[in-house]
Amino acid sequence: MLNIIKSKIKNTYKKKALNDENVSFYNKNFVPAVRDWKNSIYVYNKNTLSLIPVASRLVMKLIKGYFNSYNLNIESKLRNKRLRRRYRKLSTNKIFISEGEFKHTNDKINITLYVYNKQKLNYLAKLKKKYTSLFGKDIFIKKLQLIKSKAIGILTQQQKKSKTLTNVLPKYSTKVNKIQNIYYRTYIKKSIKRLKYYMYYKQLLYINKAKFENSYLQGLIDLIKKIYKKNIEFNIINLKYLYFNSDIYTQPLVLKLRKKRDLLRYLKDLVNKAKIEKVSLNKRSEYYFNLENLFTRNNVDITNNLLNNLMQYNKKNSEYLKKVILNDIKYKRVSGVRLEAAGRLTKRYTASRSQYKFKYKGNLVNTYSSIQGYPSSLIRGNDKPNLQYTKLNSKSRIGSFGVKGWVSGV
């Protein structure tokens, strides 16, 4: 076995020069299988593989339907007009979800989802604009005191009037009390109207938060269990910005183009949202080893000694390990975005020609491999490991159209 390993190393690892004894290599960045195929699975019966794409598509429909659910009773109280179902589907006030990454094992499936919670941000912005500025000032306290003083004045006046009415009309005392109660209720509703709307927004925020809790996710997990007949585990990653995932980045463009075909404006708005900063390229560390001394007895326990020294060093300096881990993570920053849209996208309602527009910011080049010459692996076909690519299609009243999106990292 040792001879086979030695022969493989001699064939794969070549020296830089004939006189050079040490061989230097850079760490090659291998992309996980889930990132490549969206499904990572090994089965003995190959016929079961044909059912997996259908099952994953059905599961993604269930997940998107769960996160797009809403409370009609509360939302109707906040709106003057009823929102139609078509416009609700086209609204960007929702939780955007990427395509799921499914990792299959014998008894469990790990589903990774990237989420951008636009709905939560919208509700928080409305609360901040309308209510938090009001509650933090002295105006709100003065208003409460005014409501209190007016209410006490109204009560005293009504008590005097009710006494005179009961003396004059003793038979109608019950009706007088009912009218008084209606008057009090209308006064309370008008005075605490803004506070009522504040409570509705708080309820919607609670519903939004509850969608990510285990107690509410359990119903969704039970449905997915029936499809796969395995245990389900969710790994939900909340994204800070829209452009961190290409699936999420292209979804708002499709929704906006279905509602109103103003292509160039929407492309500019989405591309300008991407914040791309200048990134300094660091040199990657090399590791050296001697082929002749690789399998000697002295180097057998080298990993154990290395880990022992690292643990002792980390006891003194805990921040060192954090720096090492963060430096080893690849594609942490966004280096470029690109959006393309083509199809029946003119503003007229006639069978016009198709349009093609694109906008980009930054670059999509794999900088470490193309500029500095470091080795890098390829994903399925000729796709680059630093790129995320999404292709979506949809249709409007005058015809169909397609949208493509790229997000590159460095």
From Swiss-Prot:
Recorded superkingdom: Eukaryota
One record GO biological process: translation
Coiled coil feature spans: none
Keywords: Mitochondrion, Ribonucleoprotein, Ribosomal protein
CC terms in the record's Gene Ontology section: mitochondrion; ribonucleoprotein complex; ribosome
GO molecular function: structural constituent of ribosome
Pfam families assigned to the protein according to its UniProt record, in alphabetical order: VAR1
Main location as per UniProt: mitochondrion
Localization terms from the record: Mitochondrion
Physiological role: Essential for mitochondrial protein synthesis and required for the maturation of small ribosomal subunits.
Family to which the UniProt record says this protein belongs: Belongs to the universal ribosomal protein uS3 family.
The protein's name: Small ribosomal subunit protein uS3m
Originating species: Emericella nidulans
